[in-house]
Regions:
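N-terminal substrate-binding region of glycoside hydrolase catalytic domains
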Residues: 1-130, 134-137, 141-144, 148-161, ...
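Noncatalytic carbohydrate-binding groove/subsite architecture in carbohydrate-active enzymes
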Residues: 69, 115-127, 132, 138, ...
């Protein structure tokens, strides 16, 4: 099945025969946290969360065309921090605004206002884009964050121990699950992982962890607090991002302890998730390949 992410030209995508698409939704562009009025809003615990109308209309225009063409759509929901966000309830208090390499931070589930804004955003997206009438387009896959095990780069929580990172992310994932399923129980929630499996990106253990540790720890925490149906959006980039010959990947071995999982050994991921301890109601977690490519 042919898929495309970060679609620039929908006509081109449809001419390519794309059947699946992943669209980025950035929380800071969606939530108008300074507003006290607006066209788009949602009530959360007696408070009103407002949304930027131009951004909502932008999502509508993309999703509607793709949906009408029969494309299955996913939303990648993440927290971009393009500049200073002093006072923003969207920014996690542990996010290192100055040093975040790619200006992508964690969702703020540490304050009451942050939870309200985040929950409002998820409920709004679920309500608008899971409606069977498909008036604004259809997207029933929500990918929460980006490449979480390499959090320093793509879900910045500052310098933080592994277990605490997973606990923080679990909170965001569970709130998203509860919020989305309060609107439509058919929405699927996905975690996001890069190709590092038993290895981690870089050497600083406060900047990242292995994908295997992240999945195992998330599963343990989720089961302890009440299991739910999360799934995996995986990025099977080649071992060397500048070498598309993935069959030459030496770190992608046929083992559950492989340093990396790429297209060469991609079968290891669904096989690992079929272990009994990862099942939910007797069913294995779904795996989608939501991002992959090559540098040039």
């Amino acid at each position: 099945i042919k898929g495309l992410q970060c679609i620039v030209d929908i006509d081109d995508a449809l001419h390519l025969g794309v059947k699946q698409a992943a669209l980025n939704v950035t929380l800071d562009q969606l939530v108008n946290w300074r507003a006290d009025s607006g066209r788009f809003s949602r009530q959360i615990d007696g408070e009103t969360v407002y949304f930027h109308s131009d951004y909502v209309e932008h999502i509508d225009s993309q999703l509607k065309r793709l949906t009408d063409a029969g494309v299955v759509n996913s939303l990648i929901i993440y927290n971009r921090i393009p500049g200073s966000r002093v006072g923003s309830p969207l920014v996690h208090p542990y996010t290192d605004l100055a040093k975040s390499p790619f200006h992508v931070g964690a969702f703020n589930l540490a304050t009451e206002e942050g939870v309200r804004m985040y929950r409002g955003a998820i409920e709004f997206l679920a309500d608008r884009y899971s409606n069977p009438r498909r008036e604004h387009g259809l997207a029933k896959r929500f990918i929460i964050g980006n490449e979480i095990q390499s959090h320093w780069h793509w879900y910045n929580l500052g310098e933080m121990p592994h277990r605490q990172v997973v606990e923080e992310y679990h909170r965001a994932l569970r709130v998203a699950h509860l919020a989305a399923h309060s609107i439509h129980p058919g929405i699927q929630l996905f975690i996001s992982l890069d190709h590092h499996w038993s290895a981690q990106m870089g050497e600083n253990t406060l900047h990242g962890m292995s994908g295997k540790y992240f999945v195992e720890t998330l599963n343990t925490i989720a089961k302890a607090e009440g299991n739910f149906d999360w799934h995996v959006a995986f990025h099977p980039y080649p071992e060397n991002l500048f070498n598309p010959r993935t069959w030459e990947d030496t770190a992608a071995t046929p083992s559950f302890d492989a340093a990396k999982i790429t297209f060469k050994n991609i079968e290891m991921l669904p096989a690992f998730l079929r272990h009994k301890r990862f099942l939910h109601n007797g069913k294995a977690r779904r795996v989608i390949l939501s991002e992959q490519g090559f540098h040039s």
